[in-house]
Curated annotation (Swiss-Prot):
It comes from Sulfolobus acidocaldarius (strain ATCC 33909 / DSM 639 / JCM 8929 / NBRC 15157 / NCIMB 11770). Zn(2+) binds at residues 19, 22, 37, 40. Belongs to the universal ribosomal protein uS14 family. Zinc-binding uS14 subfamily. This is Small ribosomal subunit protein uS14. Keywords: Metal-binding, Ribonucleoprotein, Ribosomal protein, RNA-binding, rRNA-binding, Zinc.
Length: 54
């Protein structure tokens, strides 16, 4: 085969954060230490105490 160098581990950027609930890497909300993707946040926001103002 040949030499194979594994990809470097990511330390910064969008590929680092994971959703705690589903493991998705896209559109993760980090504010307040949530680390939830926006889809999961919409499902659990009300029980967590977030309210819609409008």
């Amino acid at each position: 085969m040949g030499k194979y160098k594994p990809p470097a581990e990511r330390r910064f950027g969008k590929g680092v954060q994971l959703c705690k609930r589903c493991g998705s890497r896209d559109s993760v909300i980090q504010k307040y230490g949530l680390y939830l993707c926006r889809q999961c946040f919409r499902e659990v926001a009300y029980p967590m105490g977030f309210r819609k103002t409008r």
